[in-house]
């Protein structure tokens, strides 16, 4: 199983290099989100269970990027207002027109403004993955976004321990490079301070992350909710998608849980 995970990572990394080469030849500079970029913070990046390739394109080059992939596509998943998922060279590539949306209008406005501030500028980071250089979001945004994505995933489908591991690993591996106050400010603007504390409970108490690596330290009153989150992860299966009952839960159930998860 481990050899298969390593092989899958190698394949995905090779396809990242190919899609970057294709886009760059057509004057598109994609920003790699989550996945293989986050994996580089693991002790062995090849041992993280990988998925698809998420690329932030933005509205300007979105249709152009989709058209480029479609010439060698073998299938396509449903397109929504945020992204298109295209099966290309045996892997799924998500081209994002919109990086993500937050439910609160004021939080979402701050989130979109932050993306507009760095997208297409030298504020982005460069990272080598298996010898090929790719573009990532600025570090503070990236750390805050890893948590944001997991919190949204939790609401919609549930999460697995991998999502908490991703956040713990990026915080710890990058501890000498990151600005914890800047990350805390972003999370506060996006309405995710409480989520950061709850994830912190799991990361510190169960994954061994030092408390000082957290952007927003949790308090005693957050521990019970952190335990509830961990229990929800165990019930949901490996990646939070194995529990079929979850899809049948009423919307009010999840909005109630979301309130518990995000209120300060």
Set out the residue ranges of the language-model regions.
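Conserved NTP-donor binding/palm subdomain of two-metal-ion nucleotidyltransferases/polymerases, i.e.
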Residues: 1-51, 57-264
């Amino acid at each position: 199983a481990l050899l298969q995970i390593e092989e899958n990572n190698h394949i995905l990394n090779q396809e990242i290099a190919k899609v970057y080469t294709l886009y760059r030849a057509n004057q598109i500079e994609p920003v790699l989100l989550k996945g293989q970029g986050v994996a580089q913070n693991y002790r062995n990046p090849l041992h993280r269970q990988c998925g698809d390739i998420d690329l932030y394109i933005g509205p300007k080059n979105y249709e152009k990027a989709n058209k480029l992939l479609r010439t060698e596509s073998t299938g396509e998943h449903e397109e929504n207002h945020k992204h298109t998922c295209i099966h290309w060279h045996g892997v799924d590539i998500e081209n994002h027109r919109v990086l993500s949306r937050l439910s609160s209008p004021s939080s979402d406005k701050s989130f979109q403004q932050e993306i507009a501030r760095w997208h297409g500028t030298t504020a982005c980071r460069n990272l080598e993955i298996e010898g090929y250089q790719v573009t990532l979001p600025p570090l503070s945004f990236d750390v805050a976004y890893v948590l944001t994505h997991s919190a949204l995933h939790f609401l919609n489908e549930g999460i697995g321990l991998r999502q908490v591991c991703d956040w713990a690993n990026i915080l710890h591996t990058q501890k000498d490079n990151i600005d914890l106050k800047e990350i805390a400010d972003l999370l506060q603007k996006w309405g995710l301070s409480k989520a950061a504390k709850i994830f912190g409970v799991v990361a510190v108490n169960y994954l061994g992350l030092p408390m000082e690596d957290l952007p927003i330290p949790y308090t005693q009153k957050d521990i019970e909710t952190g335990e509830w989150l961990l229990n929800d992860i165990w019930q949901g299966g490996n990646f939070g998608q194995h529990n079929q009952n979850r899809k049948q839960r009423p919307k009010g159930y999840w909005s109630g849980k979301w309130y518990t998860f995000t209120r300060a």
